[in-house]
From Swiss-Prot:
This is Large ribosomal subunit protein uL1. One of its GO terms (cellular component) is large ribosomal subunit. Transmembrane segments: none annotated. PANTHER family: 54S RIBOSOMAL PROTEIN L1, MITOCHONDRIAL (PTHR36427), LARGE RIBOSOMAL SUBUNIT PROTEIN UL1M (PTHR36427:SF3). Signal peptide: none annotated. Gene3D superfamilies: 3.30.190.20, 3.40.50.790. PROSITE patterns: RIBOSOMAL_L1. Belongs to the universal ribosomal protein uL1 family. Part of the 50S ribosomal subunit. SUPFAM superfamilies: Ribosomal protein L1. CDD domains: Ribosomal_L1 (cd00403). GO terms for biological process: regulation of translation; translation. It comes from the Bacteria.
Length: 233
């Protein structure tokens, strides 16, 4: 894959093999970001698990103390009094069969979907459509619930879902380039702490094998995983 001039120049400003302290790595990411938009800052953590085994799955949610910097559009499948609750809590779209029909027609103008348990008969039919896009409501992610008000407010405030992929890597946004380094570090620590708490009992050896932070358009800066784990025990 051919990289642009800015990407190549950014990679010359630091040692790609060095394992940096978390704060120093985030400072470097901010320094080398040159895009003309407010890039997302991401973290990618390789875990010492084998995702092929059910007892080594890592999945959950975490509320980032400083949010992600992105305004998320929340869609809610609900009926009865829960419709009003969702609207008052700030949901962008609320409905039932009407929303299902729009989605089946190719509409996806939302970032996260929430459903009350009594709407899963409707939502379940769209598993093959929503699932591959990461939009399917799921009890483990806290998006199938009757506690609509709290869930919407948490999602709007910066609650994110994470899940280990087939390569045993977990990916997450931890803010924007415009965030102060301390705010990014607080979000990184919150995410790392959540991952440590979610460690499967079956995981063996060093849990965090590698940690990389980057912005949307910049190369990754490596963080010493042992330092990050020690700071968030």
């Amino acid at each position: 894959m051919k990289r642009g001039k800015n990407y190549q120049q950014a990679g010359e400003k630091f040692d790609r093999l060095t394992l940096y302290e978390p704060k120093e790595a985030l400072e470097l990411v901010k320094e080398i970001a040159k895009a003309k938009f407010d890039e997302t800052v991401e973290v990618h953590i390789k875990l010492g698990v084998d995702p092929r085994h059910a007892d080594q799955q890592v999945r959950g949610t975490v509320s980032l103390p400083n949010g992600t910097g992105k305004t998320r559009k929340v869609l809610v499948f609900a009926k009865g009094e829960k419709i009003k609750e969702a609207e008052l809590a700030g949901a962008d779209y609320v409905g039932g069969e009407d929303l299902a029909e729009k989605i089946q027609g190719g509409w996806f103008d939302f970032d996260v979907a929430v459903a009350t348990p009594d709407m899963m008969a409707v939502v379940g039919k769209m598993g093959k459509i929503l699932g591959p896009r990461g939009l399917m409501p799921n009890p483990k992610a806290g998006t199938v619930t009757f506690d609509i008000e709290r869930t919407i407010k948490e999602l709007k405030a910066g609650r994110i879902e994470y899940r280990v992929d087939k390569s045993a890597i977990v990916h997450a946004p931890i803010g924007r380039i415009s965030f102060e380094v301390d705010k990014l570090q607080e979000n990184l620590n919150a995410f790392a702490e959540a991952l440590l708490k979610a460690r499967p009992a079956a995981a063996k050896g060093q849990y965090m094998r590698s940690v990389t932070v980057c912005s949307t358009m910049s190369p990754g800066v490596k963080i010493n995983p042992l330092v990050l784990m020690a700071a968030n025990k």
